[in-house]
């Protein structure tokens, strides 16, 4: 829901700001300070910075630890990849979207590059946050494993996928495509065609095919409404089960 392209489908909850950050993103509400008001109460905000503190401890100290060099490089890479991921979540939830012309002056978020309880927090610009995210990813990717120890740790495909998404959010489409193609080189990941998978389920559970009609009633504007700049892509004519709102220019 970061960019307002896919979000919660319930009209009343969006319009009434039941979940403020979802509504802010969907409605592109850039009222000054509105996102920042929710940092104190947001579980996402506190948990991301808590995890970042742990990653900073690893980044600062792993090279001084005992053990094989390969293990140290792996720990460093995975910590930086996850630090980048958490900063990406934070900057897209609590700051303005990346716009090349204004990113250097748009207020971003606080960056903690080291674990230091005495250090005074500093707010960085959106551009500086994205630069730091990309710096971490570029450093991490060469040492990320093709297959991690378990699914809770980042893999090489994760690193490339996150890099692709960062490029996408910056509007760097060629770079996003190239990074995405690197993901598909993985032995352990592939693209799924969800439509035939859905139809296989419908064949076994026929009532599923009627659920999209109910979801369609939550549309914030009718499909033909001139104010509706979005297509309810997964609920139009193809019978897919869940309504994702996709901006018209994305489909065009």
Name every feature range the model reports, one short phrase each.
Residues 1-6:
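Acidic, glycine-rich segments characteristic of secretory precursors and extracytoplasmic regions
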Residues 19-94, 124, 142-146:
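Conserved, well-structured interaction surfaces
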Residues 54, 136, 143, 179-182:
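Alpha-helical solenoid repeat scaffolds, predominantly canonical TPR units
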Residues 91-98, 148, 169-171:
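Short coil/turn linking the two alpha-helices of tandem helical-hairpin repeats
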Residues 100-121, 190-208:
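Short, flexible helix-coil linker/hinge segments at the edges of structured domains or between repeats
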Residues 177-252:
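Hydrophobic-face positions in mid-chain alpha helices that act as interaction patches
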């Amino acid at each position: 829901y970061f960019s307002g392209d896919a979000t919660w489908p319930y009209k009343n909850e969006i319009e009434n700001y039941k979940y403020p950050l979802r509504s802010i993103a969907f409605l592109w509400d850039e009222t000054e300070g509105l996102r920042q008001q929710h940092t104190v109460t947001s579980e996402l905000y506190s948990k991301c910075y808590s995890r970042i503190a742990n990653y900073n401890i690893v980044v600062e100290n792993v090279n001084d630890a005992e053990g094989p060099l390969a293990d140290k490089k792996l720990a460093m890479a995975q910590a930086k990849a996850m630090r980048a991921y958490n900063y990406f979540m934070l900057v897209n939830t609590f700051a303005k979207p990346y716009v090349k012309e204004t990113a250097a002056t748009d207020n971003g978020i606080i960056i903690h590059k080291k674990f230091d309880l005495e250090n005074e927090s500093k707010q960085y610009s959106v551009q500086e946050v994205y630069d730091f995210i990309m710096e971490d990813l570029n450093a991490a990717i060469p040492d990320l494993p093709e297959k991690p120890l378990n699914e809770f740790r980042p893999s090489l495909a994760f690193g490339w996928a996150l890099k692709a998404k960062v490029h996408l959010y910056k509007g760097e489409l060629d770079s996003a495509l190239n990074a995405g193609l690197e993901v598909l080189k993985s032995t352990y990941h592939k693209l799924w065609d969800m439509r035939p998978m859905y139809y296989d389920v419908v064949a076994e559970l026929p009532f599923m095919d009627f659920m999209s009609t109910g979801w369609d009633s939550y549309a914030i504007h009718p499909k033909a409404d001139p104010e509706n700049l979005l297509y309810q892509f997964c609920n139009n004519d193809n019978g897919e089960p869940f309504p994702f709102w996709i901006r018209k220019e994305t489909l065009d």
